[in-house]
């Protein structure tokens, strides 16, 4: 009997040793996973040195994956089967994702540095109270022009209809953008759901067609940089890259009204490492890191202490940091339901067909 007890005791000891080894290995694996952060962001939308600095300061390794459109990002997160701890979508997509329960509500007890974000960039209609997102970059829709190809700077939307701009204007290929500039030229909201206002706008846009050289998306950069068009309607973020390559280009935000856009940090429901996600948010809220990122990417930072550290000519540039009066007249694109999304798309298609 003693031999049997000894044998059983030996078996139990072996099991305990094996269990201990397995637990240790599992702990090491989990520890290694807990020290990894997976970021899903636009391409070339962060200074790579910041990712290295984040790892040095926190010990957390970064896996950086990119998308080329909000829709591509949304589809991948919606389908599941992925692990993203941080994503950086635009404002209208944040609205959609929170409504579809794809985002984790933020725990502000874990966030440090929110006071660095300007109050004008918080509590926007797409995320009231910033329950799901923290501003990363922001910008405007405006007019980029080549000062050697125009006699007067086109500072207002109505200027685009001047006859001297025949076959000179590039428009961004988007229903909200084109109909929005038309609505704004009347002083209407770019989120208008007034049928009469929309009809007036389309009629006015028909009269713009002789001045339109092309309706494009990414191709606008090439046209403007290579002096192949005098004027373009596009986003400030795109313009910052154009200005670096063509010293004759200028950018203006029409003071009467225009679009205000945001790209914000969110934590998707695909998150595996929330602690690392909050560590990254806090890291990017530090002024020195927001400054480095703004200088690398060239976009406008919502971090006020970081903005104050920019070169004087940059932070005083009203093209990228409009004054308070201009900011009052800027609107974000509100989320439309299926009916109004379809309405705008149909009107935009009519406009493009008329142009042909």
Give a label for each model feature:
Residues 324-356:
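Conserved C-terminal helix/tail region of periplasmic/extracytoplasmic solute-binding proteins
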Residues 198-207, 245-269:
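Periplasmic-binding protein-like
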Residues 268-328:
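Mature extracytoplasmic/periplasmic domains
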Residues 1-14, 21-23:
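N-terminal Sec-pathway targeting helices
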Residues 93-96, 225-226, 231-248:
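A ligand-binding cleft/hinge motif common to bilobed small-molecule-binding domains
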Residues 98-105, 127-131, 241-253, 315-318:
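Ligand-binding "clamshell"
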Residues 83, 88-228:
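Extracytoplasmic ligand-binding site segments that recognize negatively charged/polar headgroups
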Residues 7, 19-96:
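Early extracytoplasmic/lumenal segment of secretory-pathway proteins
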């Amino acid at each position: 009997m003693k031999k049997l007890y000894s044998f059983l005791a030996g078996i139990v000891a072996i099991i305990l040793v094996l269990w201990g080894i397995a637990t240790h290995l599992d702990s090491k694996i989990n520890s290694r996973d807990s020290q990894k952060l997976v970021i899903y962001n636009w391409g070339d939308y962060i200074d790579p040195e910041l990712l290295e600095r984040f790892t040095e300061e926190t010990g957390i390794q970064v896996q950086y994956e990119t998308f080329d459109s909000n829709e591509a990002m949304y589809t991948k997160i919606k389908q599941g089967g992925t692990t993203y701890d941080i994503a950086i979508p635009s404002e209208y997509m944040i609205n959609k994702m929170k409504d579809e329960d794809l985002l984790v509500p933020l725990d502000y007890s874990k966030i440090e540095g929110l006071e660095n974000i300007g109050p004008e960039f918080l509590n926007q209609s797409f995320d009231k109270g910033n329950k799901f997102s923290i501003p990363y970059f922001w910008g405007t829709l405006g007019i980029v022009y080549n000062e050697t190809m125009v006699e007067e700077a086109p500072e207002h939307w109505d200027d685009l209809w001047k006859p001297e701009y025949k076959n000179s204007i590039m428009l961004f290929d988007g229903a909200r953008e084109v109909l929005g500039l038309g609505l704004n030229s009347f002083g209407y909201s770019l989120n208008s759901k007034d049928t009469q206002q929309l009809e007036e706008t389309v009629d006015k846009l028909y009269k713009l067609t002789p001045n339109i050289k092309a309706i494009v998306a990414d191709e606008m950069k090439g046209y403007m940089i290579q002096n192949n068009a005098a004027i373009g309607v596009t986003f400030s973020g795109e313009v910052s890259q154009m200005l670096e390559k063509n010293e004759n280009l200028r950018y203006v935000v029409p003071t009467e009204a225009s679009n205000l856009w945001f790209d914000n940090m969110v934590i998707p429901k695909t998150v595996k490492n929330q602690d690392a996600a909050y560590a990254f948010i806090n890291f990017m809220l530090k002024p020195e890191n927001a400054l480095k990122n703004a200088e690398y990417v060239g976009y406008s930072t919502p971090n006020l202490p970081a903005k104050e550290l920019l070169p004087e000519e940059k932070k005083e540039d009203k093209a990228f940091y409009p004054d308070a009066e201009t900011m009052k007249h800027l609107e974000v694109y509100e989320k439309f339901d299926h009916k109004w999304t379809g309405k705008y798309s149909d009107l935009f298609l009519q406009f493009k067909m008329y142009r042909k």
